């Protein structure tokens, strides 16, 4: 909800809806931008209505704090796989892919991953990708893997390592020194940058890399 408020307050996005399990309905005020979907007895999403809700949006942001409930993970993975609108996953939402059917999910051209190097390492392994990516690799090695990976899959990637922000799309990789941006190694992962990337790509939907680089400043 904090990220939705940040997005709605700082950028002229017409509607910012927050999708929540209906188990929380009695605990929250009846605000018009809350969308409640059916939940399990434990308070997690059942999966009902997720895909339909995502297709009603111009852009989807899965900000994280995802329940570890197996039903939730399975249904979110299925919804992301068929998402017809651009969908950015960040923080622990990225792990949905590695735990689902990564090779098929990664074929969705609307998918954007704002992921750490360890998350990408896990994902490439789960997808049986023939190259590795690790924290100990050089910037050039990581960039080369992202170059090849985004040629193999139509997925876009934003990550950070060795003081550099890396943005990859369709085989093109751009590196931006973090020290030249408005973010630190901590605030990079707060969710606000992910939200800003969503906003900038709504304004300029035809150039993912340029829009995402602009979000850093």
What are the functions of these language-model segments?
Residues 1-86, 95-109, 117, 124-217:
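Small-residue (G/A/S/T)-rich helix-start motifs and N-terminal tracts that mark the onset
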Residues 114:
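Active-site segments of SGNH/GDSL-like serine hydrolases
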């Amino acid at each position: 909800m904090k990220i939705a408020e940040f997005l709605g307050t700082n950028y002229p996005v017409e509607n910012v809806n927050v999708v929540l399990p209906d188990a929380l309905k009695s605990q929250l005020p009846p605000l018009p931008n809350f969308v409640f979907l059916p939940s399990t007895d434990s308070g997690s999403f059942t999966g009902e209505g997720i895909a339909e809700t995502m297709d009603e949006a111009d852009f989807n942001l899965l900000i994280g704090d995802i329940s570890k409930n197996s039903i939730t993970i399975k249904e979110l993975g299925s919804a992301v796989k068929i998402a017809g609108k651009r969908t950015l996953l960040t923080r622990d939402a990225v792990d949905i892919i590695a735990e689902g059917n990564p090779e098929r999910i990664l074929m969705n051209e609307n998918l954007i991953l704002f992921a750490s190097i360890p998350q990408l390492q896990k994902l490439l392994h789960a997808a049986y990708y023939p190259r590795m990516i690790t924290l100990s690799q050089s910037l050039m090695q990581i960039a080369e893997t992202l170059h090849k990976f985004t040629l193999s899959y139509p997925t876009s990637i934003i990550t950070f390592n060795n003081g550099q922000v890396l943005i990859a799309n369709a085989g093109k990789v751009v590196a931006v020194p973090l020290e030249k941006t408005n973010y630190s190694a901590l605030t990079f992962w707060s969710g606000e940058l992910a939200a800003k990337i969503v906003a900038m790509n709504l304004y300029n939907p035809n150039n993912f890399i340029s829009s995402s680089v602009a979000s850093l400043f």
